[in-house]
Amino acid sequence: MASSKLLKERIESIQDTMKITNAMYLISSSKLRKARQNYQNVLPYFTRMRDTISRVVPHLPDEPEHPFFHERDLENPKRAYIVLTADKGMAGAYNQNLLKFLREHADQNDRFYVIGQVGYRALFRKDPRLVEDFHYGATAPTLQRARDITVDAIDDFKSGKLDEIYIVYTKIQNALTSEPVMERLLPLDRAHLTPAPKGLGDPRGEVEMFPDAWTVFEQTAPIYMHGMIFGAMTESFCAEQSARMTAMDSATKSAKDMIHDLDLEYNRSRQGSITQEITEIIGGAAAVQNQE
């Protein structure tokens, strides 16, 4: 059995750790609320933008096909994955699950554009598919960051450097679970953006566009893609905070259980020490009486 002093030191050390994990839980909870609120603030704008695109797409000419819809019929297309990881750890298996999902779906010749310090460090100089000069943080997603990433993606797609671009991020399924998902950014899916046929007399049926549908789509499609990336970044950040809250809550509960067990052991140790001291005193007193 460990000494009372050693047990006391272990209890104090675990109590200090528990304070840290509890503080991290509260911080993650606050960040999660702010991120969700930020996303809800801009969601109506991007929802309206997607609605606008859905009304424009049916008016686009079939020939020539817009480059954003062009699916290149190649045997080995040049694919890229925009991967959204976290800037920090201590979030359970959040980052590990995402990177495992990525490796399971990617081919050897694909390219990884990683957002987040954890994913970047995990792949840096270990996986040749990592694009090392693409380096963005994941904390506090902003529209400007999403816009910069979208511009880079569109330029690489239009130039032919890339044939397909996907976003890999963690999607919140419900209050308790989240899982990695993959969505295609480019080329856009025309069928997905085309609304269902409307009935006669529907005010959305006829749309007049200036100067033409092609130009309107050219201006609105990048904004729609900004929204896709910003939405993925925000949801990933929310999933990260949720995972960290769960991990820190579990760590705090484990610390409480350990402290409870150590308290029992400490009390037994003290009781044993006290019993031994009493026994020694009684033995000493008896020895003195015998000498007298």
Residue ranges and their predicted role:
Residues 1-292:
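C-terminal beta-strand-loop-alpha-helix "lid" module of Rossmann-like NAD(P)-dependent dehydrogenases
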